[in-house]
């Protein structure tokens, strides 16, 4: 996928970290009246460490750790609380994970903080959430071509048909659309500084559609789908394209519906896409 950035001089709407935090906090507060006192939340605590004798941590040890591991010797302790409840056609889920680590780029980490509300077949969730690529087994892979689990979750707001629904007895559908905001501006400023160019306050967009063919109660299932992720907007610190790279509502729309500006023109953002195929054979007599 060819991709470059283009600058705009129009009035912009900046979604900074403070505003994002307010949106997520409000979303979490909206859940409080809906959560009863009849079900207790689940809590956990875990400890992890990675020690090596070479120059860097092996890739397979860093992968799928959602940013809690690092190339240096590292250790962390993480605790969290989660809540799930179903009320008639409503499903409510929320989770908060906090960690203290050494050997990485941060000491105090908000690893996960999200709320998920679903009504029948439609759903919305917002916050930092650990995600993996659809149909990818994290125990057998170090990540997908577009999205891996090697970095910390970024704040997102996602809406769509988050679980498969039946269109016909043999065809199911799942659709997702989300927007997010990268929060690594301070990290880039510390590590890149005044030497190299970088982009801060970058936006993120994801959309995907998946179909499942077959009866879930029988042996064979076939899944097919496509996903597209886009980094767009933000502000370049220096270089030939320094300044505003597009942060208005129009740029959010352009990320959702990419357009071709003609030969010689740049696309708005960095587009990456991947197709997914999965064939499943289910045998209830074999325990996996």
Model-flagged regions — what are they?
Residues 38-77, 85-96:
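Transmembrane beta-strand segments of Gram-negative outer membrane beta-barrel proteins
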Residues 39-43, 83-93, 118-122, 164-174, ...:
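Short loop/turn motifs that connect adjacent beta-strands in outer-membrane beta-barrel proteins
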Residues 49-57, 85, 98-104, 119-121, ...:
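Transmembrane beta-strands of outer-membrane beta-barrel pores
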Residues 64-67, 97-101, 142-147, 192-197, ...:
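Extracellular loop and loop/strand-boundary signature of outer-membrane beta-barrel proteins
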Residues 69-77, 107-111, 150-160, 201-207, ...:
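Residues that define the transmembrane beta-barrel architecture of outer-membrane proteins
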Residues 77-85, 113-119, 126, 157-163, ...:
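Residues on the lipid-exposed face of transmembrane beta-strands in outer-membrane beta-barrel proteins
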Residues 132-238:
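Internal, well-ordered domain-core segments that constitute the primary functional module
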Residues 222-224, 232-288:
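Long, internal scaffold/assembly segments composed of regular secondary structure
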């Amino acid at each position: 996928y060819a991709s470059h950035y283009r600058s705009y001089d129009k009035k912009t709407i900046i979604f900074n970290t403070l505003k994002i935090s307010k949106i997520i906090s409000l979303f979490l507060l909206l859940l409080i009246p809906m959560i009863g006192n009849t079900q207790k939340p689940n809590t956990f605590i875990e400890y992890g460490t990675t020690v090596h004798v070479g120059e860097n941590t092996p890739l397979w040890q860093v992968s799928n750790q959602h940013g809690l591991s690092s190339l240096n010797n590292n250790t962390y302790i993480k605790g969290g609380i989660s809540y799930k409840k179903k009320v008639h056609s409503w499903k409510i889920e929320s989770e908060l994970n906090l960690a203290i680590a050494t050997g990485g780029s941060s000491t105090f980490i908000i690893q996960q903080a999200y709320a998920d509300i679903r009504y029948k077949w439609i759903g919305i969730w917002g916050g930092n959430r650990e995600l993996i690529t659809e149909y990818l087994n994290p125990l057998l892979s170090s990540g997908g071509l577009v999205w891996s689990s090697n970095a910390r979750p970024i704040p997102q707001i996602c809406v769509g048909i988050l679980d498969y629904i039946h269109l016909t007895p043999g065809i199911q559908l799942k659709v997702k659309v989300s927007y997010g905001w990268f929060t690594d501006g301070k990290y880039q400023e510390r590590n890149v500084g005044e030497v190299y160019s970088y982009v801060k306050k970058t936006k993120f967009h994801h959309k995907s559609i998946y179909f499942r063919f077959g009866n879930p109660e029988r042996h064979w299932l076939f899944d097919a789908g496509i996903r597209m992720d886009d980094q767009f907007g933000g502000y370049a610190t220096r270089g030939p394209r320094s300044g505003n790279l597009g942060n208005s509502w129009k740029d959010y729309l352009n990320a959702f519906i990419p357009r071709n500006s003609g030969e010689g023109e740049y696309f708005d953002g960095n587009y990456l896409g991947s197709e997914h195929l999965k064939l499943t054979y289910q045998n209830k007599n074999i325990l996996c």
